[in-house]
C-alpha cells in the first residue's frame, strides 16, 4: 500500500464520518432495537436503522477508490456487495455504531463510529467519531493524530492529555476493577471499545481499559489504537506487554494510558 492510499482513505472518509455521526446523533433515542437473527449474544444481535444508514454513508464514498479491498463491515447492507475483495492485503474495517446495545440505545457511555484501513493486517489509516461528545479523530501511520469538533470544525493536532482523573472502561471490565480504581481517586466511566481505544485523547480522561468478552479483542476494537499511538498514548496488554500491532494477533486485555503511571494504576486494578 502506498502512503497515498491511507491519505485518500482519510480524505474520502472524513466528511462521510461526519455525516454518519450526524445520522447516528439525529436518530438517537428515536429508533428501536431490531434483533439480528442468528446472533450469539444480545450485544451482537443489536441493530437499529441508524446502524445501517450510518454504514451506507461510509461505504458509498469508498466504493470507487477502494472497490478491490477486502471489506469487513459490521452490518449486511446493500453497498457491501460493491467491494470485490480481490486485493486481500488491503482490508477496510467498518463499525457504523460501536456499542449499539449498551451505549447507543442504553446510554451507558460514549458510542463510536469507526473505520480503519489495514495493509498486511496492520492499520495504516483510522478514523473514530464520538457523536455524543462531538469529536472526530483520525490518524495516518507515522504522521500523528488529528481531531476536530463535529459537525464542521477545523482539524488540529491531537495529543494525550495529562489533566483530570477520568478513566474509561469497557463493559467487559469487572465492576470490582472499577471500584478499586474509584478507591484510588479516579473518576470511572464506561464506554464502547472504540471510545476506550482513544480514551486518553478525551478531555479530562487519563486512560482506558478493555477486557474482551470473547477470546480476543476484535479487529474493530483496535481501529482507534492507531490514533492513540500516533497521539503519544501508552498502549499495553493487561500484563504490561506491548499490545500487538497486527490486528488479528490474540490479545484479551487492553490498557491505553496517557503515561506510565496511569498504565500501572490500570494494570494493578486489573490484577490486584
Walk through the language-model features, giving the residues of each:
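Fold-independent oxyanion-binding glycine-rich loops
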Residues: 74-75, 96-97, 131, 171-172, ...
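An extended, acidic
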Residues: 157-272
Amino acid at each position: 500500500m502506498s502512503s497515498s492510499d491511507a491519505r485518500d482513505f482519510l480524505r474520502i472518509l472524513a466528511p462521510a464520518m461526519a455525516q454518519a455521526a450526524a445520522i447516528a446523533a439525529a436518530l438517537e433515542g428515536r429508533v428501536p432495537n431490531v434483533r439480528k437473527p442468528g446472533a450469539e449474544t444480545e450485544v451482537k444481535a443489536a441493530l437499529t436503522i441508524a446502524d445501517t444508514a450510518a454504514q451506507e454513508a461510509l461505504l458509498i464514498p469508498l466504493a470507487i477508490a477502494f472497490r478491490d479491498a477486502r471489506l469487513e463491515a459490521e452490518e449486511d447492507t446493500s453497498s457491501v456487495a460493491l467491494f470485490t475483495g480481490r486485493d486481500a492485503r488491503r482490508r477496510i474495517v467498518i463499525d457504523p455504531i460501536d456499542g449499539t446495545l449498551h451505549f447507543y440505545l442504553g446510554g451507558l457511555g460514549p458510542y463510536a463510529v469507526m473505520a480503519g484501513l489495514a495493509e498486511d493486517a496492520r492499520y495504516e489509516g483510522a478514523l473514530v467519531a464520538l457523536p455524543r461528545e462531538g469529536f472526530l479523530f483520525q490518524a495516518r501511520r507515522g504522521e500523528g493524530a488529528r481531531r476536530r469538533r463535529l459537525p464542521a470544525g477545523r482539524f488540529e493536532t491531537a495529543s494525550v492529555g495529562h489533566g483530570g482523573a477520568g478513566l474509561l472502561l469497557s463493559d467487559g471490565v469487572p465492576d470490582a476493577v472499577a471500584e478499586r480504581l474509584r478507591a484510588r481517586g479516579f473518576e470511572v466511566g464506561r464506554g464502547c471499545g472504540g471510545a476506550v481505544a482513544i480514551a486518553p485523547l478525551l478531555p479530562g480522561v487519563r486512560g482506558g481499559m478493555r477486557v474482551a468478552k470473547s477470546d480476543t479483542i476484535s479487529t474493530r476494537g483496535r481501529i482507534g489504537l492507531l490514533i492513540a499511538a500516533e497521539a503519544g498514548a501508552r498502549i499495553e496488554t493487561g500484563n504490561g506487554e506491548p499490545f500487538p500491532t497486527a490486528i488479528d494477533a490474540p490479545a484479551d486485555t487492553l490498557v491505553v494510558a496517557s503515561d506510565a503511571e496511569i498504565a500501572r494504576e490500570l494494570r494493578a486494578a486489573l490484577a490486584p
